[in-house]
Amino acid sequence: MKGRIAILLLTAVVLTATSSIIPAPAEYTCAGDARYKTEALSRPRILQGSRAGKAFRTRVSGLPRFAQEEAYELTVGTCGATIRALTPEGVFRARQTLRKLELTDTSRLCCTIFDYPRYEHRGLMIDESRSFKGKEFIKKELDAMALLGLNSLHLHLTDAAGWRIEIKSHPELTERVAWRIGYTYTDWEAGGYKFASAGDPDAYGGYYSQEDLKEIVAYAAELYIQVIPEIEMPGHSMEVNRTYPELACIDASGRRRNSSWDLCPGNEGTFRLLEDVLSEVIAIFPCKYIHIGGDEAVMRDWPSCVNCRARMEAEGFTEVRQLQGYMVGRICRWLQEHGRTAVGWDEILETGLPRDAVVMSWRGSAGGEKAAAAGHKVIMSPNTHCYFDYYQDLIRKEPLAVGELTSLHWVYTYDPGDDPHVLGLQANLWCEKVPTVQHAEYMLYPRLFAIAEIGWSPKSRKKDPVEFRARAHSLLDALRKLGYNGFDMDTESDFAIAGLRRTQKGEIIYPSF
């Protein structure tokens, strides 16, 4: 095995101008050995729309609409830089490339770059329920996302561990379950899942006011990043049932049941609450997508619930799990009536789903492939490659995490495929084990660089993990100078550098492209 690792680790890397840019552009050419001065990057000439020229417009005309809008041509010469693009967004992407050249390009070779994204959706999810970090953290990560060409931030705002969004029609949600006893999720769990009020000296938590969220949305819009809010249902909803116990399932004896943290799909009050919440959510977030969760509903209380049984009888259902399909379908239709499109984790596909709903595949890629075959739009986010709460090096070297070894090399091997239903991909940072801003950035960088390159760079560009690692190291050094934390690539184990994994039986899994 040592010999195999040695081959995979073959280095002797020399950074060139191309290797300084992440994500790698579609086309890059150098103008001989002429070199530019840094000042040449500061005030580019902008040729936008019709001024971009017939040659550029013709060149991008065959691209998908989203790619045309983000496409640009950047020429950097001894006398300055010129940007050609159809839209302000294309100009913005070119400016971000100029910034990366300034941060990481040591060659200073004059060059021409023609560039556009491979996928429409290039995203990051941050779990704010389990560990609340606040708007300044979010804005800081938005800056990094923009530098990487990412264009979608998914905020996981509600879960059992805390409700993080102000709902003015239901202030109890933030008064009662935005604060808890336990700094980390593990502490809260060990202490018996206790909530607290904001004034409690032992309370940990917080929430976003609607003004906070509008500020985040506006900030993201300036960076051409959409913000997708997630309101979990029907599972992962203990905090809602704690706030409104009258909405929990009820058995034949009249006893309220909430053993599985699920909302009750038989209670009309559940839908009134969700519609109230979503009405305020869509007023805050202009994004066409609203994430409704849909994962890991346990359904333990539904079979004995008189309201759920009545719903099943009224709808002609023969299986309890059809109640999840009822709830998801009803909320999807409500969102559609209000001009929005529902997104949900891949479980929503299991019990029938309106055609316009988007499926986010997390349990590997199979759910996404099935959804695409059924005609649904898909965002690939498999836990095998895109879960950044997983270890990124050997367990003995790393802070407490979950899951399998998911190194930079391993993430870089992923490809979402070419099915036209696939909108793109997304990294997910769940925060049960990630309580601080510094820890979050440690888990994100440099692995998020790989997601950015997979989402942007053309498939025709052959992947070279050694060359990519060199570019990642350079960009990570630049981010550190800007005040970001990150994984220590200098101490990464040979096992992780080679992109290896070990099965539960101890067998070695080698990366493949």
Residue ranges and their predicted role:
Residues K2-A12, T16-R122, T341-L349, L353, ...:
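Acidic, contiguous N-terminal accessory segments
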Residues P23-A24, A67-Y289, R330, W334, ...:
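Feature activates predominantly on carbohydrate-active enzymes
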Residues A342-E347, G352-A357, R363-F513:
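Flexible, acidic glycine-rich loops studded with aromatic residues
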Residues E70, E230-E232, E296, E347, ...:
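Acidic-residue sensor for enzyme active/binding pockets
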Residues F132-G134, A160-E166, P234-V240, H291, ...:
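Flexible loop/turn segments at secondary-structure boundaries
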Residues F137-K140, Y208-E215, G269-D276, Q322-R330, ...:
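Generic recognition of stable, solvent-exposed alpha-helical segments in well-folded globular domains
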Residues V240-E246, I250-A357, W362-A374:
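Active-site neighborhood of glycoside hydrolase catalytic domains
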